[in-house]
Every structure is written in structure tokens, then in C-alpha cells.
Amino acid sequence: MSKGCITAITCCSLIIFFSSIIYYFFYWPNVQARATYQLINLIDDSLRKYRSDYPESKDLENSSKTISALLGNNSRNKTYLHTKNILVREKQFVDYWKRPIIFIESNGNTRISSNGRNGIHGDNDDIQPSFPGIKSK
């Protein structure tokens, strides 16, 4: 191989290497945050629809029972979520950082959120849905 080809291949490899580092450290965290925000809204909307169809359901929590009901294993066989739209690990919904999504029940409301990039609950990087909590009747 000629010296010019080796130099060109080395330069291309370095460009690809540095581009991937820049992508991983600067762009990918923003992609994770946006994708988690969309996931939280999707799960929240599905819980809202499920709660309107089954107002007697009291506790909706991050468990295999809730996941199964939303995927269509309910008395109406109605699908509220599709498996391709969610992330499940160890029978729990998880965000794009692979941390469990937080379900909080209080006074008949179900609030869901993600701990965000740093994994600490209750600070300013937590990701909440755009809609208010889901009220049970």
C-alpha cells in the first residue's frame, strides 16, 4: 500500500474516532433526556387512558402487573402500550439511563417521573410528564 493510502485511512479513522467521542459526551445525553421525556409522556397517557377505562383500579405502580395490564392483559384485552414503545428491565419500566421510573400514588393521583441524568430524585433535572397527575374516582 502506498504511504498516501495509509495516511488517508489514518486520518479518516481519527476523524471517526473524535466524532464518536464528541457525539457520546455532548449529543447523546440530550438524546437520552428527550427520549425519556417522550417515554414518560407515553406511559402517563397510557395510564390516564387505563384509569379512565378502569376507575376502580386504585394502585398503579411500576410493576409487572401494571405493565401486563397496559400491554393488553386486562378484562377488555385492550392494548394501551406496545412493547416496541417501552423499556422494561427486571419487570419495571425504566428510562433511557436504565433506572426505574418513579410511580407516586397520593390521594388517588398517580404521578410518574424519571430521576433524570444524575439519578437523584427531587432535583431540577427530574423529568415529569407534560400533563397533571392521573386522578382515580
Where are these regions (language model features)?
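Amphipathic alpha-helical segments typified by the pilin-like N-terminal helix
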Residues: 2-38
